[in-house]
Amino acid sequence: MNLRKLRLLFVMCIGLTLILTAVPAHARTITNNEMGNHSGYDYELWKDYGNTSMTLNNGGAFSAGWNNIGNALFRKGKKFDSTRTHHQLGNISINYNASFNPGGNSYLCVYGWTQSPLAEYYIVDSWGTYRPTGAYKGSFYADGGTYDIYETTRVNQPSIIGIATFKQYWSVRQTKRTSGTVSVSAHFRKWESLGMPMGKMYETAFTVEGYQSSGSANVMTNQLFIGN
């Protein structure tokens, strides 16, 4: 085979590789409790009861619909192994763009858990009929807006380790938005400065949550960056 043919074969192989790696993951719809990995992102649909539907799209994108529920969470992000702190993981941020149609109490947020100590956390950018609150800890400015910080305690409630008592940490934006950047690590650092300790990271995910409500959301963009 001459040099020209070898070069042509090489170019054809490279082109085929690029085409294969560019093929998007097939969309998949789930309706009951399930977790797994899709298109490079960890996902989970969790509900206690009611009607739910979650369509897993390419990358971090997904859509969600719910009605007649008690509590339901739809999310795509990253589940860690609870061995490293957010400091050890490096900077965490999320770029997102969504349409959000809450028919009652629901949140558009960054959500997750830590262990040792066990804590559930929310960075809420938009909500439905109820704006989350709790014991006020302070406020700070991030990503073009001011967030109010609250702490609550859940007693004998479901958690990632079963029924437990644990803290909830909240950053709630004063003005709603449905697109932008969330500098997740900036919230973690602010919480710690206010005496709200972060443990080993279990999860960070872009999340739609509904509580005793109906609604829908379409998360067109959800890009999670870790260690940048």
Swiss-Prot record:
InterPro entries: ConA-like_dom_sf, GH11/12, GH11_AS_1, GH11_AS_2, GH11_dom, Glyco_hydro_11. GO terms for biological process: xylan catabolic process. It catalyses: Endohydrolysis of (1->4)-beta-D-xylosidic linkages in xylans. Its EC number is 3.2.1.8. It comes from the Bacteria. The keyword Signal applies. Residues 1-27 form the signal peptide. Residues 29-222 form the GH11 domain. Pfam families: Glyco_hydro_11. The keyword Signal applies. One of its GO terms (molecular function) is endo-1,4-beta-xylanase activity. Pathway: Glycan degradation; xylan degradation. Keywords: Carbohydrate metabolism, Glycosidase, Hydrolase, Polysaccharide degradation, Signal, Xylan degradation. Belongs to the glycosyl hydrolase 11 (cellulase G) family. This is Endo-1,4-beta-xylanase A. It comes from Bacillus pumilus (Bacillus mesentericus).
